Amino acid sequence: MENSRLEILAELQRKVLWLATWTIHNANHIRPNPSGLKVGGHQASSASLATVMTALYFAVLRPEDRVAVKPHASPIFHAIQYLFGQQTLEKLQNFRGFKGAQSYPSRTKDIDDVDFSTGSVGLGVAQTLFSSLVQDYVRAKGWGTDRPEGHMVALIGDAEMDEGNIFEALAEGWKHGLRKTWWVVDYNRQSLDAVVREGLWTKFETMFRNFGWDVVVLRHGRLQEAAFAEPGGERLRDWIEACPNQLYSALTFQGGAAWRRRLLNDLCKQEGADQGPVSALIERRSDDALATLMGNLGGHDLPSLLEAFEQARTHDRPVCFIAYTIKGFGLPLAGHKDNHAGLMTPEQIAIMRQSLSVRAGHEWDKFEGTSLPEDVLRGFLAAAPFIAQGTRRLTAPIIPVPDALTVPAQPAMSTQHGFGLLMHEIAKTDTDLARRIVTTS
């Protein structure tokens, strides 16, 4: 059953990546564009989170959970919602256009069950932390006990970790005993204007642990771990973990033959050591198999992701997942130094379409080109825990508010003093309004 589950999730991951990539391609190359200006859409940034979001939305998340999706992964989010039946074809076809699916997830403009608006980089991340604290406050007041507590999840672009409000939020979480919060860092190490500084993940790990978080580093997938267990494998592990981010990305873009040349040069020409085992490890793999192995980072490995997320559900401690990924994973843009705002060419999209057995004219079909029966995929989607209760837009009863408040009887006072007196008077009443006012400073 587990193998079948992984097979289905892998098929859905490929479909999600295709739909997201095609949505962006349609907006830039097919839809009428009188201005001639680039529409954009961040194909590479979306691709790096496709596996993580597949694991979460199709297998791990529950209806009570809430997710802040990093802004540039909105095409992946919309594709997932489309497969769930909670996004329309028309909205996808008008992505980044009038009345279309939004560039960045928007709770007010999108129709597909967005939990947090994340267009302002970094703010959605911190909002999940404070939402978790509010959930605890509501529970402490005895409200909402008829519903299970949810996890507040942020999917974070690694460059978002430059935003100062995130670090301020971490301190607040520590002060108030933060629980049930997951932050998943999409650690692809490439952004618009830089490559992430070497070793930054160790600083993240130390910082989060200092604030009481568990830290799970998802660096290697199962294929890599299996290779490390082979003779010569530990030397391959050491090379991967010491490889500079810029070099790893460049070799990813160049492909299997480039990987082979570099690995053989670096690992098999060292004096004073028998190079047989590590040479054999490399040479028994084809170029394609070697490229697949080197791309099998933890953030692209479904078994590793599922295990990590499901383990984290067994407790309520906050968890930071540092998921190593490749920007543009699964696309010809993978690893390219300029892929942040890059777009696949019509020729590249045609090759991808053919490789996925998607017929021309059927690009939007939900199950076109899938290797598993449509009824199997439909059944799996229908049974996904996340959508068990449909869309999750909830309402609460309106709290009565008096038309006017009694003005404090003082000959003169500051506005701060007056506001404090008003709050004091409200607090003395036995009303729903008094019970629900929260003051902050």
What are these regions (language model features)?
Residues I156-A159, V185-D186, A323:
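Active-site flanking residues adjacent to catalytic metal/cofactor-binding acidic residues
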Residues E160-G164, N296-L306, A412-G420, H424:
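Active-site glycine- and acidic-residue-rich loops that bind
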Residues E11-W18, D65-R66, S371-S441:
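Non-catalytic terminal/interface segments that mediate subunit docking, oligomerization
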Residues D65-V67, G150-M152, T181, R317-T325, ...:
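Generic beta-sheet signal
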Residues Y187-P408:
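Long, well-ordered, tryptophan-enriched scaffold segments
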Residues H72, A323-I326, S441:
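Short, well-ordered beta-to-alpha junction loops that form the rim of enzyme active sites
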Residues S4-V16, A20, I24-P34, Q43-H176, ...:
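Cofactor-binding active-site loop characterized by glycine-rich and histidine/acidic residues
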Residues V67-K70, K180-N188, T440:
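Short internal beta-strands
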